[in-house]
Amino acid sequence: MQRSIMSFFQPTTTEGKAKKPEKEIPSSIREKEPPPKVALKERNRAVPESDSPVKRPGRKVAQVLSSEGEDEDEAPGTPQVQKPVSDSKQSSPPSPDSCPENSPVFNCSPSMDISPSGFPKRRTARKQLPKRTIQDTLEEPNEDKAKAVKKRKKEDPQTPPESLTEAEEVNQKEEQVEDQPTVPPEPTESPESVTLTKTENIPMCKAGVKQKPQEEEQSKPPARGAKPLSSFFTPRKPAVKTEVKQEESDTPRKEETKGAPDPTNYNPSKSNYHPIEDACWKHGQKVPFLAVARTFEKIEEVSARLKMVETLSNLLRSVVALSPTDLLPVLYLSLNRLGPPQQGLELGVGDGVLLKAVAQATGRQLESIRAEVAEKGDVGLVAENSRSTQRLMLPSPPLTVSGVFTKFCDIARLTGSASMAKKMDIIKGLFVACRYSEARFIARSLSGRLRLGLAEQSVLAALAQAGSLTPPGQEFPTVVVDAGKGKTAEARKMWLEEQGMILKQTFCEVPDLDRIIPVLLEHGLESLPEHCKLSPGVPLKPMLAHPTRGVREVLKRFEEVDFTCEYKYYGQRAQIHVLEGGEVKIFSRNQEDNSGKYPDIISRIPKIKHPSVTSFILDTEAVAWDREKKQIQPFQVLTTRKRKEVDASEIQVQVCLYAFDLIYLNGESLARQPLSRRRQLLRENFVETEGEFVFATSLDTKDIEQIAEFLEQSVKDSCEGLMVKTLDVDATYEIAKRSHNWLKLKKDYLEGVGDTLDLVVIGAYLGRGKRPGRYGGFLLAAYDEESEELAAICKLGTGFSDEELEEHHQNMQALLLPTPRPYVRIDGAVAPNHWLDPSIVWEVKCADLTLSPIYRAARGMVDKEKGISLRFPRFIRVREDKQPEQATTSDQVASLYRKQSQIQNQQSSDLDSDVEDY
């Protein structure tokens, strides 16, 4: 009969006779006595062995491999194959209610070796290994059967419901173990009679026997979530309370995750998007970078511009409502920038460094990564694939938008000999922490080629929608999540367009998100014009001119208004800013800070202004100047000048500033003033210096002959032609716009197309004959603003010198792609030998424009089925100051074609009338 453990520690009581010690029972009888079939631990509904801190020794070779102490392999609750001799197959440690007679750990019999002081002697595996008996041999098949049962149960586990958390799954398994049918054991004493308290007196010899498992427990590492040892010798009731507490602690965890879905399932492109309920993070938390990556994925999957804007807008709405401090980093990551252009922060990580970082972070061979990049043509996809195949023992914390953006800025600011190693460490750290598609877009951002088709105007449109639909500045929980709700589709569209114009106009005057975003979050979108105004130090996007084909077109357009003609100088745009403190800044047409490029110009600023002038913004053209001959030098001479950190004493190419507009003066913006007033203030407050600072040569006239003569003279004076501008009517300075109030007239316009075109190089053809081994032709494309795609327009092969072809061939090796970018459209054009990353802009001249069934540019704008191509295109120069998004658009191509047709028709009609009159 199985007895409780207390019977071995208690003296004879009045309730019954004292039981004889176990040692008095002959061993032969003890072997024949059947063991208990189920441990009392299970019968008392105690925790399973898997949760018990009392584990069996991990080193199997140190266990006694006899019938008294077999190693246990069965899982908790698994039906045991009973032995006729030993009960040591139970997986759980001996419970306090029973003392297995043959247990090697809790052997309560005096037959155990005991020292004279009453403590059990130390037993070693080698000394205690008994000889194998026939009984052991007969028990081995039973062990094999039990292990087979265990294996089948492991291979066919019960799948818990998907809604259960990890803690609930464990509890469910425990309940299944407890509910398994068991053979009732022999009656024992009540739980109260077997409870061991601290106040009970235990004999020294018994205490010594009890102390052995405690010492073994102390020598083992603590189990996960280990409890005090005494808790495992208590009844089931406290264990139930513990489980209830665990379930209660798990309940708020499930409630927390209910409102914040997993970022892996985040979908900002869904219809009826809710900025709070559909977000994958909570109020006050940092925006996970995976949310931005998922947004980029959705944008990459579509080609419709409106859908792109809507998807990005949904993400921005959630950021505004939940984590407004992360709005600025999200916008810069969407634009693939690190700040305003004037800060000059660029990542500039080459593909070689990027591939090495991917290899070291993922453990792949560099050669295999390079081969995969050559095959796929996208370092981002290769990084994502390499990262997805790696498994980490301890995953890194999830990436956040602010964390990634900060790391990018750190990379851009690192300089010096050791900077490359530091950059490598930062990049490796980012890749190690990446999940899913995060590696793809981090790699693309680092390479400077995010290329989602998200132009600046699209990002601004998305920001305007987000700031309008989900107004910032609301206390959480946000009351208004969709301010456009209730409006008709047409009214909603017009309202969003008006809101977008407010933001775009503000951005034209203050193209600095660092200044705009704080104001937007504090005061709202409609208050931007009041708080964000034009000021020195913040570069403006310059006003641009439309081309014309001849003097007659100019007179026809400006028939009833006064206008002026100015020389069009062949140089680089230079926007001169002088702040109130006297600091001088010079910016390019792309808002890049060129102050370090022109130290000679900065030194002459105090001489060109009157003392009363404290601050101003001048629009000028920097032109190469020959001081000896006192004449303008060709544009190519200016391009040889050093670009950064120029020492004034080492300057060889001198420049002269030709000023033609004044936008800001002494704290007042002049952009709304007419040109006549701006020109007057320019000449009153500044002084000319020959060869250093000169006003643009101009002529106010409406006489066609005088304009023609003035045009001829401009060409003789090494200028491109004329700029014709209105003086009073519609004569404001339209920032960042190509206005019809400014017209450009070149000498070449009178012979053919009204303007040169700035086109993007998307492919290269290998040369033949005189040009073997290098590129002899190139495939060019125009930019489509509506779809934000590049559409092929012509093949170019003339206008190059041998030196230029060699230089182009070398520079383009770093731009090679196995396939074109997804936003490049060629249709029926002949595919080039090598595809190129579309990042180079060339200025091209042609004889005329023609309809083409092959090229896609401007398709559907003039003809439903045909596009427009160039006849006899010729290379002019590289436009280093332009990005692909600033290339000639399809609308401009169609406009040039229409003007060409109109003039041809007018000329033919004039000839017909002359013939009739003759």
Swiss-Prot record:
Task: Please list the residues that bind Mg(2+) 1.
Answer: E621
Could you tell me which residues belong to the region Interaction with target DNA? 642-644
Which keywords annotate this record? Acetylation, ATP-binding, Cell cycle, Cell division, DNA damage, DNA recombination, DNA repair, DNA replication, Ligase, Magnesium, Metal-binding, Nucleotide-binding, Nucleus, Phosphoprotein
Q: Which InterPro entries match?
A: ATP-dep_DNA_ligase, DNA_ligase_ATP-dep, DNA_ligase_ATP-dep_C, DNA_ligase_ATP-dep_cent, DNA_ligase_ATP-dep_CS, DNA_ligase_ATP-dep_N, DNA_ligase_N_sf, NA-bd_OB-fold
A Gene Ontology biological process noted in the UniProt record is: double-strand break repair via nonhomologous end joining
GO CC field: nucleus
Show which residues form the site (Interaction with target DNA): R305, N590, K770, K795
Tell me the cofactors it needs. Mg(2+)
Which segments show compositional bias classed as Low complexity?
Answer: 81-92
In Gene Ontology terms, what is one molecular function of this protein? ATP binding
Compositional bias (Basic and acidic residues) spans? 16-54, 240-259
Q: Cite the record's note on assembly.
A: Interacts with PCNA. Interacts with POLB.
Protein function: DNA ligase that seals nicks in double-stranded during DNA repair. Also involved in DNA replication and DNA recombination.
Its recorded name reads DNA ligase 1
Q: Which organism is it from?
A: Rattus norvegicus (Rat)
User: Which gene holds the coding sequence for this protein?
Assistant: Lig1
